[in-house]
Amino acid sequence: MTEDTLPDTVPDTVLDTVLDTVLDTAISEPSMTAGEVEMQLFALERSRAQFAWKCGGLDAAGLRKPHPPSAMTLGGLLKHLALVEDQNVSIALTGQPLGAPWDAVDFEAEPDWEWRSAVDDSPEDLYALWRGAVQRSRAAWAEALEDEDLDRPSKFTTPSARSPNRRRFLVDLHDEYARHVGHADLLREAVDGLVGEDPPQR
């Protein structure tokens, strides 16, 4: 759902709230002659779109609903994957410390902070956090891969002074989504019965 697909009768105050909880689920197909970089980025974007479809448009109750015996929630997934996006860029591409809100958290003392604290966040804040992290990550990877060289070393150095290449971190990011999209499938079905693999496209 986008602004131009909403009824004309929706008041502006309601429209702002609705759009705050709507996530982009568009999937752009790769070219028929796509190389490795284009295909890797397409796979990541498709998983992001699938995740957005399963998490988008919900109120606080929907985002906080667990699927027993697991305590996992869609809100927790949004916050966790926002952290993963920012960590991936920080570790692999920039070598810079994490910014807000992550820099104020002692993850050694609270390793599950993003999962636990999501219950206190509004839907608008959770959606904005995830959107912002995706935008930063997308921009950072686009800049890093202007040379289309996934073999270049990342900014991360192991204790043995080795640096995994950028391919490793891009695959790791997609793998994290692939894992959690499956969780989101089950959680969303339990909320309102939504099922399916890919979000409907125009």
Locate the predicted segments by residue.
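An N-terminal RHG(E/S)-centered segment typical of histidine phosphatases
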Residues: 1-6, 24-27
